[in-house]
Amino acid sequence: MAYAYLFKYIIIGDTGVGKSCLLLQFTDKRFQPVHDLTIGVEFGARMITIDGKQIKLQIWDTAGQESFRSITRSYYRGAAGALLVYDITRRDTFNHLTTWLEDARQHSNSNMVIMLIGNKSDLESRREVKKEEGEAFAREHGLIFMETSAKTASNVEEAFINTAKEIYEKIQEGVFDINNEANGIKIGPQHAATNATLAGNQGGQQAGGGCC
């Protein structure tokens, strides 16, 4: 299917926070309770619609283990959006967010949109990190924030789509150079066709005006 833009995402965070499950829920609308550890990088894609335009999301799910960190770093470059995930039932995954964020900002495009996600909101009885703590961290670092559940699908759609909306707004504001694919954005055939139609219409109007 033709798309107007392609946005590249990267999902980062500690091992076991539910990165692969979030991706699977978003792309396939299913939950897999037992998931093999991601080795290196896995990939998923899905089409969404923003402002009447088809947007293709190309999503890279990275390994959380320290031994794969150098591989993860190479995927920061060329990403327009990042989902930084922690597990609300494991305080240590929240404590490691600063390290992940520093890594992301050091190796990525400065305009990359980062969504902070507190995953496993269905496990409220085992919560170790308050929602207010996630909100405060996001405010302090200029991130978007949501709590999600890959198991129940709560807020999963919204997390991926709201990140895309933020990227799209930055394109409209001229923040992203969409002609530079290193920014994680690719112009699709639908966008090119629309522009060609607009140019043709403008040309026709100008020619018509010259006859009067």
Swiss-Prot record:
Binding-site residues for GTP, renumbered to this chain: 16-21, 38, 64, 119-120, 122, 150-151
InterPro entries named in the record: P-loop_NTPase, Rab_GTPases_membrane_traffic, Small_GTP-bd, Small_GTPase
Motif (Switch 1): 37-42
PTM notes: Prenylated. Prenylation is required for association with cellular membranes.
CDD domains: Rab2 (cd01866)
Binding locations of Mg(2+): 20, 38, 61
Cellular compartment(s): Endoplasmic reticulum-Golgi intermediate compartment membrane; Melanosome; Endoplasmic reticulum membrane; Golgi apparatus membrane
Regulation: Regulated by guanine nucleotide exchange factors (GEFs) which promote the exchange of bound GDP for free GTP, GTPase activating proteins (GAPs) which increase the GTP hydrolysis activity, and GDP dissociation inhibitors (GDIs) which inhibit the dissociation of the nucleotide from the GTPase.
Catalysed reactions, semicolon-separated: GTP + H2O = GDP + phosphate + H(+)
Record-listed E.C. numbers: 3.6.5.2
Membrane topology field: Lipid-anchor
Subunit text: Interacts with PRKCI. Interacts with TRIP11. Interacts (in GTP-bound form) with GARIN1B.
Described purpose of this protein according to its UniProt entry: The small GTPases Rab are key regulators of intracellular membrane trafficking, from the formation of transport vesicles to their fusion with membranes. Rabs cycle between active GTP-bound and inactive GDP-bound states. In their active state, drive transport of vesicular carriers from donor organelles to acceptor organelles to regulate the membrane traffic that maintains organelle identity and morphology.
Name this protein carries in UniProt: Ras-related protein Rab-2A
